[in-house]
Curated annotation (Swiss-Prot):
Listed name of the protein: 2-C-methyl-D-erythritol 4-phosphate cytidylyltransferase
Family, per entry: Belongs to the IspD/TarI cytidylyltransferase family. IspD subfamily.
EC number: 2.7.7.60
This protein's UniProt keywords: Isoprene biosynthesis, Nucleotidyltransferase, Transferase
UniProt-listed PROSITE patterns: ISPD
Length: 234
């Protein structure tokens, strides 16, 4: 098999969300993080990796912030239309990859736009562990705290065995064709899809969990942003 016959690796960044819980004047991916926007920090790890063929960012149609970023002019970054839900945006990104020459058996890494602290080590580990995997998988972190299930009155109904519980992170890495089918079929069926792994699970696959760093945080609240400010040099 020649190098050109091997599956390529691509990245999709869904970035059409508004992040209402941040209570900010702009979407959280455009907030400042040590002198640069969150999304620029997020893209760095992928744009610097030699194994990745290309990257697609899925943006809201009327996004006024993206055009002003240096990365918007990069030949390595392509744009796709974002959707109402994450799954819609990812599907749009996958279709854009096909237009760029990606194949159904190529790998796609989907990563949160507001998860800027991914390390090169975690990205390398994901690529190495999943490149030969029949399904694909995701970065995840084992649950470390005691977990409780509540009833409808907010009282503990049971304690959950944390040894079998993981927190799902990103990137999540799957074959382009399989992921496209899973997402499209789930949307048609009206299934609630929270991430790419949940679509693959619904389609009958068992994604592999690849342990990553706990500081690969997704910015959801103002407190998350403050925590991450300490991780980046000013």
């Amino acid at each position: 098999m020649t190098t050109s016959d091997l599956p390529a690796f691509w990245t999709v960044i869904p970035a059409a969300g508004v992040g209402s819980r941040m209570r900010a004047d702009r979407p959280k991916q455009y907030l400042d993080l040590a002198g640069r926007t969150v999304i620029e920090r997020t893209l760095d790890c992928f744009l610097e990796h030699p194994m990745l063929r290309g990257l697609v960012v899925c943006l809201a149609e009327d996004d006024p912030y993206w055009p002003g970023l240096d990365c918007a002019a990069s030949r390595h970054v392509q744009r796709a239309a974002g959707g109402v839900e994450r799954a819609d945006s990812v599907l749009s990104g996958l279709l854009r990859l096909l237009e760029l020459g990606a194949r159904a058996d190529d790998w796609v890494l989907v990563h949160d736009a507001a998860r800027p602290n991914l390390t090169r080590g975690d990205l390398d580990r994901l690529l190495e562990e999943l490149a030969e995997d029949p399904v694909g998988g995701l970065l995840a972190v084992p649950a470390r705290d005691t977990l409780k299930r509540s009833d409808r009155d907010g009282r503990v109904s049971e304690t959950i065995d944390r040894s079998v519980v993981w927190l799902a992170y990103t990137p999540q890495m799957f074959r382009l064709g399989a992921l496209h089918r899973a997402l499209a079929d789930a949307l048609v069926a009206g299934v609630a899809i929270t991430d790419e792994a949940s679509a693959m699970e619904w389609a009958g696959y068992a994604p592999k969990l690849v342990e990553g760093r706990a500081d690969n945080l997704k910015i959801t609240t103002p407190e998350d942003l403050l925590r991450l400010q300490r991780s980046f040099p000013h």
